[in-house]
Amino acid sequence: MTILSNDILTVEVSGHGAELQSIRKGDVEYLWQGDPSFWGRRSPVLFPIVGSVWESRYRVGGKEYQMGQHGFARDMEFTLVSCSQTEVRYRLESSDETLARYPYPFLLEIAYRLHGNSLDVVWDVMNPSDCDIYFQIGAHPAFFYPDYDPEKSGRGFFTFDRNEDLECIRIKEKGCVDAETKWSLDMPGGRLKLEKDTFDSIDTIMLQDSQIRRVNMFREDGSLWLSLSFDAPVTGIWSPPGKVAPFICIEPWYGRCDRVGYEGDYRDKDWVNRLAPGKKFESVYTIEIA
């Protein structure tokens, strides 16, 4: 476990999955702590897929592979590359084990960088091969509801950098989406009200096409709790349906689950990223604690 700290925040990161474990301001914990009765993870990195592939199978060049939801990086041990008081970097490289499940060579580095009341999460994906590679990558951080009470309905609310005319798509079958049906996101007064049953019928709120770039999470009294900012083209918002869970996930994605029934090549799936030989994909998202 690596601990980063400054005068405001203390952050913990594990080498297993290069997964964020804790964000504390004083004695207050902001990151969900992984109670398995609700959801046993905290902030997994999703790679080389985001979400599910149809029937847990996908095809590359006519060959079929098996892949579980959200890929394998979250369950692998990363190598520590560098560490200071405010920054740590981990690395995962392709191996015989990964190539048996995902036929593209890769080098994935994940860094956490603390500054003031903010934490940058940095992703670098490199292509060491002489052919194009295709991948998806995403975040899945879970944050405590600050005013959680299982007996009460209200959980606070979200605002976005854009609060009008937002459209979302929904999970339909076997973890895959109906990509053609768009639903208007109801935001009276520019607020997405969070209730204990918000996700019981929809599973995930999924916004595509870079509709939003910032999510602000507010307490019931209207005070700001935290914010996420990002450049990812797809955003997922999720809490376990039917569990009255004490947390919510805000998920920037460079990717998305398959359409229902998709059986094409992996390189042609929705929201896949192509990386040329010797090139590097770079991205960062920022968690800002109020």
Language-model-derived ranges and their functions:
Residues 81-88, 113-118, 147, 151, ...:
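A short, structured loop/turn motif at beta-sheet edges
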Residues 109-111, 270-275:
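Beta-strand-rich interaction surfaces with strong enrichment in secreted/lumenal proteins
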